[in-house]
From Swiss-Prot:
Residue ranges crossing the lipid bilayer per the database entry: none
Hydrolase keyword on record: no
Ranges in coiled-coil conformation: none
Alphabetically ordered keywords of this record: Glycosyltransferase, Magnesium, Pyrimidine biosynthesis, Transferase
Record-linked PANTHER family: OROTATE PHOSPHORIBOSYLTRANSFERASE 1-RELATED
Record's protein name: Orotate phosphoribosyltransferase
Principal EC category: transferase
Pfam families reported in the protein's UniProt record: Pribosyltran
GO cellular component: cytoplasm
Gene Ontology MF terms in the entry: magnesium ion binding; orotate phosphoribosyltransferase activity
NCBIfam families assigned: pyrE (TIGR00336)
Pathway assigned to this chain's UniProt record: Pyrimidine metabolism; UMP biosynthesis via de novo pathway; UMP from orotate: step 1/2
Record bears the keyword Magnesium: yes
Length: 213
């Protein structure tokens, strides 16, 4: 695990974005941890989060021309990442997002920001079922651009209904590179290093043994 990944997980705990306990997921599974990126809800939180995304993206070596933020959660994430890439990594890239509802006045259309062209990196919080990513891929392709990857905050590294995770399915189905700031494996390593989280650590390890990929 890299330093920035450990710092990111500490930041998530500090802000209550990452919590331990018993949480029922949409899948019906009882998860020993919960991640809610919507709780990064101040200007400084969002700026710092953008820097973590930018770091992970830069270290991945992914080749892309612009960013796309899926409505709604992906919009501030793509904006914060675009700012961080420009300010800290010397990459001033265009970015774009979609509206959930097409506008019928003014400029109209369902896309806002830079025109979707070239190689596009999608920015979102997590991939659960992969539905939002599939919608984004359709939007990008319909505009004549090429989706090349997805950057997410946390990779839960767990199986979907079959043997593969939603992330593995997205990678295989669309040939997309998935970049994460941190993964479940990083979280477990972080918990071991931190100490004081032993009770939760056992539950997270048991969950990974049952549902992990």
């Amino acid at each position: 695990m890299k330093t920035y990944q450990s710092e990111f997980l500490a930041f998530c705990l500090e802000r209550g974005v990452l919590r331990f306990g018993e949480f029922t997921l949409k899948s019906g599974r009882i998860s020993p941890y919960f991640f809610n990126a919507g709780l990064f809800n101040t200007g400084s939180d969002l700026a710092r989060l953008g820097r973590f995304y930018a770091q992970a993206i830069s270290e991945s070596g992914a080749a892309f021309d612009m960013l796309f933020g899926p409505a709604y959660k992906g919009i501030p994430l793509a904006a914060a990442t675009a700012i961080a890439l420009a300010e800290h990594h010397g990459r001033d890239l265009p970015w774009c997002f979609n509206r959930k509802e097409a506008k019928d006045h003014g400029e109209g259309g369902s896309l806002v920001g830079a025109p979707l062209t070239g190689r596009v990196l999608i920015v979102d919080d997590v991939i659960t079922a992969g539905t939002a990513i599939r919608e984004s891929v359709d939007i990008i392709r319909a505009a004549g651009a090429e989706p090349v990857g997805v950057a997410i905050a946390l990779n839960r590294q767990e199986r979907g209904k079959g043997e593969h995770s939603a992330i593995q399915e997205v990678e295989a189905e669309y040939g997309l590179k998935v970049i994460n700031i941190a993964s479940l494996g990083d979280l477990i390593e972080f918990m071991r290093e931190q100490g004081g989280l032993d009770e939760h650590l056992k539950a997270v390890e048991a969950y990974r043994a049952q549902y992990g990929v």
